[in-house]
Amino acid sequence: MITVAAPEAQPQVAAAVDEAPPEAVTVFRSKLPDIDIPSHLPLHEYCFARAAELPDAPCLIAAATGRTYTFAETRLLCRRAAAALHRLGVGHGDRVMVLLQNCVEFAVAFFAASFLGAVTTAANPFCTPQEIHKQFKASGVKLILTQSVYVDKLRQHEAFPRIDACTVGDDTLTVITIDDDEATPEGCLPFWDLIADADEGSVPEVAISPDDPVALPFSSGTTGLPKGVVLTHRSVVSGVAQQVDGENPNLHMGAGDVALCVLPLFHIFSLNSVLLCAVRAGAAVALMPRFEMGAMLGAIERWRVTVAAVVPPLVLALAKNPFVERHDLSSIRIVLSGAAPLGKELEDALRARLPQAIFGQGYGMTEAGPVLSMCPAFAKEPTPAKSGSCGTVVRNAELKVVDPDTGFSLGRNLPGEICIRGPQIMKGYLNDPEATAATIDVEGWLHTGDIGYVDDDDEVFIVDRVKELIKFKGFQVPPAELESLLIAHPSIADAAVVPQKDDVAGEVPVAFVVRAADSDITEESIKEFISKQVVFYKRLHKVHFIHAIPKSASGKILRRELRAKLAAC
């Protein structure tokens, strides 16, 4: 059972900032009118609401193979998958881990779990066995859906239960593999055989509350180690509706549109703003397992992609790679950039390459459900947005800016910490009431840890980050995680990790290390030590040796001093 303590039951931990007096609070809202959100519906029912009127329209496209599933076929597959999972003992409140790159099976499994009232926690298949196990254990996973090539990761970590298809128990693990072109690994179950044998009529009728969890992504929040973010049916439905519902949707797409899904679905931006928004709107989703420039350009051209969700490294590739000119990308009408800020130079370069497309940015974080603001130029009745703007706050939500030191509300054009309140924000962190109370205050405001301001036209601009997270190509790299690994090395006395600007990745993690007495440990040995324990984007790009880590009187690492050292190099 996933539980999150109610605010009144949570320990009295100080919020990220103190609240300003109510009469002094300046609240910013969307330029678009609020809408009726059917948040009483379970997520699968909400997303497939148009399936009956679009039965033969394309829904999911496996871009690499060309296999296309209509809305009718997709919904049927999801129900059969739900029946198969139910037969394996998955029920209301159970957690299912999806350890996959983007594929049709990922989407089907996510919706199948929703039909059963179960919860999906998606993990990055490129993570190390140790990292996967941490998420597995924290989530209380009952079953894993993966690909044969990743099964060895589950066998390599001794703390994983034994994989066994015949026995269900606390000391065994049920693993389903999606491959249909090779032998199923020993002890695993073949996904498509389970689907073929399933009866969609056997899916149980489950009483699902809007406050039941449906997704459990992991995020490092504003500080610290990765934590499970509890997103309910209400919060996810609300987050999708804020983007694509209403007479003038903020992100306008529908039948006939094709959304490119090349960003990983284990990232909330892709799951929410691409897959779920497209299905709800009646658009097709072209699923690509990974980013490869030639394959992506070919998919855009072949499937006539109209909506492309990207992150800054993809924008850089589209803007600068000469291969782009060999492909017809004229079908693209919307380019939505998220996950990390984007510079004006890149914006201008992309506009020169795709002059017919509307380009804009959104701003979000996993805990916020995830979108806080979106470019108003994407709306059905568009209004222009400034360069560098993250758009205006989403509908049915409130945004305020507070002084990070005093907590008092700030007016327009004054930078401070961005806070958001609305039905889309998380229920809380999994089994972590202290972190929840430190992020969501007693009035329901979620403190993002990002510094920004709202201008005279209600547009949101992000200018800095209070939180310590490093953003490598849009992926989160929590310094605390790397620091704990570094300090565990017997030849390292102390360590700190900070971001360094990078033209391609945005930011890369760099370590400052204090050697232990009599140690002569080298940079290469430290980098190798870390690379064996973390996913590729968390690997250290540089190690600097210093005599002491600068810290405050309370022992907090003075990261600004270390960043200044990097800038001076």
UniProtKB/Swiss-Prot annotation:
Induction: Induced by UV irradiation. Down-regulated by wounding. It catalyses: (E)-ferulate + ATP + CoA = (E)-feruloyl-CoA + AMP + diphosphate; (E)-4-coumarate + ATP + CoA = (E)-4-coumaroyl-CoA + AMP + diphosphate; (E)-caffeate + ATP + CoA = (E)-caffeoyl-CoA + AMP + diphosphate; (E)-cinnamate + ATP + CoA = (E)-cinnamoyl-CoA + AMP + diphosphate. InterPro entries: AMP-bd_C, AMP-bd_C_sf, AMP-binding_CS, AMP-dep_synth/lig_dom, ANL_N_sf. The keyword rRNA processing does not apply. Keywords: ATP-binding, Ligase, Magnesium, Nucleotide-binding, Phenylpropanoid metabolism. Residues 292-361 are annotated as: SBD1. One of its GO terms (biological process) is phenylpropanoid metabolic process. PROSITE patterns: AMP_BINDING. Residues 362-429 are annotated as: SBD2. Pathway: Phytoalexin biosynthesis; 3,4',5-trihydroxystilbene biosynthesis; 3,4',5-trihydroxystilbene from trans-4-coumarate: step 1/2. Pfam families: AMP-binding, AMP-binding_C. ATP binds at S219, S220, G221, T222, T223, K227, Q361, G362, T366, D450, R465, K556. Belongs to the ATP-dependent AMP-binding enzyme family. This is 4-coumarate--CoA ligase 2. It comes from Oryza sativa subsp. japonica (Rice). The lineage of its organism: Eukaryota, Viridiplantae, Streptophyta, Embryophyta, Tracheophyta.
